[in-house]
Swiss-Prot record:
Pathway: Secondary metabolite biosynthesis; flavonoid biosynthesis. The lineage of its organism: Eukaryota, Viridiplantae, Streptophyta, Embryophyta, Tracheophyta. Optimum temperature is 55 degrees Celsius. Gene3D superfamilies: NAD(P)-binding Rossmann-like Domain. It is an enzyme of class 1 (oxidoreductase). Belongs to the NAD(P)-dependent epimerase/dehydratase family. Dihydroflavonol-4-reductase subfamily. One of its GO terms (biological process) is flavonoid biosynthetic process. Flowers and young siliques. Detected specifically in the endothelium of seed coat. One of its GO terms (molecular function) is anthocyanidin reductase activity. It comes from Arabidopsis thaliana. Inhibited by (+)-catechin, quercetin and (+)- and (-)-dihydroquercetin. Not inhibited by salt. Positive cooperativity with NADPH acting as cosubstrate and modulator. This is Anthocyanidin reductase. Its EC number is 1.3.1.77.
Length: 340
């Protein structure tokens, strides 16, 4: 693995998991920045799932490769000639009855397989791994005004003992990221991890990604997503957002920033369940908004700090108004919400 960060000729990057929401927006930003881009998908024959990638090919040199996180040997061709590897994909199965088998072990093995492939590459200079705020903010601390930064890790022992709603996902993100750091240090891989809050804003996908469905649940009224958002605050202590375009820009920014190192929280806005409902009622009066919640959700316990990222020179472009304006527009365009 090449440790220098100087460019030679055309810049080239690989985005793992191109069918995802963040991955597709990241690919768009890379192409618009002059990169040649390779992306991996599990099934390149599924035209519905890669339709947005076909459209993105109009922006520049985008090649689609078949690869699977469970198969170490499937990444070699997609990594060829790439300076940066963006490991955005993660196994998600919230309906699983065996999260260890379906999420935790595949996430860990996927990280190892990707990093092993990077070691074999002669071109890879830096790996950017997408972690999650779920790897930082979940604990049994009490009180309010808690500030979480990159030094904090989610309490896996607490999650294992209590097994709260969707407990497998945060454990998978913690253990996968820690595995990435251990492997990178042992093998001298230049690794940066990005820790995003709940991803909001627009989408290039034909079906709404789960993060947008959660964010819009007080308007759609979908019980599963309403429960998910409320449980997120109970577990994490707040609801924190980042716009998908800001998050994609942060990935590219940290790839190219020579001084970047370690973990970076990427969060633009910290709030709570009732505050979201109040905001939606005021800004979008033509929609029915769920606004009755149990006690204990009114005050956010903690905030996620992006100060380290800001200190590197990054600036967020989108606030909560723009995030929700774009989600409203997206859901309206899909016929998923109706006015009163």
């Amino acid at each position: 693995m090449d440790q220098t960060l100087t460019h030679t000729g055309s810049k080239k990057a690989c985005v793992i998991g191109g069918t995802g929401n963040l991955a597709s927006i990241l690919i768009k930003h890379l192409l618009q920045s002059g990169y040649k881009v390779n992306t991996t998908v599990r099934d390149p024959e599924n035209e519905k799932k890669i339709a947005h990638l076909r459209k993105l090919q109009e922006l520049g040199d985008l090649k689609i490769f078949k690869a699977d996180l469970t198969d170490e040997d499937s990444f070699e061709s997609s990594f060829s000639g790439c300076e940066y590897i963006f490991h955005v994909a993660t196994p998600i199965n919230f309906k699983s009855e065996d999260p260890e088998k379906d999420m935790i072990k595949p996430a860990i093995q996927g990280v190892i397989n990707v990093l092993k492939s990077c070691l074999k590459s002669k071109s890879v200079k830096r790996v950017i791994y997408t972690s999650s705020a779920a790897a930082v903010s979940i604990n049994n601390l009490s009180g309010t005004g808690i500030v979480m930064n990159e030094e904090n890790w989610t309490d896996v022992e607490f999650l294992t003992e209590e097994k709260p709603f969707n407990w497998g996902y945060p454990i998978s993100k913690v253990l996968a990221e820690k595995t990435a750091w251990e492997f990178a240090k042992e093998n001298k891989i230049n690794l940066v991890t990005v820790i995003p809050a709940l991803i909001a804003g627009n989408s290039l996908l034909s079906d709404p990604p789960s993060s947008l469905s959660l964010s819009m649940s007080f308007i759609t009224g979908k019980e599963m997503h309403v429960t998910g958002l409320k449980e997120m605050q109970k577990l994490s202590g707040s609801i924190s957002f980042v716009h998908v375009d800001d998050l994609a820009r942060a990935h590219l920014f940290l790839a190219e920033k020579e001084t970047a190192s370690g973990r970076y929280i990427c969060c633009a806005y910290n709030t709570s369940v009732p505050e979201i409902a109040d905001f939606l009622i005021q800004r979008y009066p033509k929609y029915n908004v769920l606004s009755e919640f149990e006690e204990g959700l009114s005050i956010p316990k903690l905030t996620l700090s992006s100060q380290k990222l800001i200190n590197e020179g990054f600036r967020f472009e989108y606030g909560i108004n723009e995030m929700y304006d774009q989600m409203i527009e997206y859901f309206e365009s899909k016929g998923l919400i109706k006015a009163k």
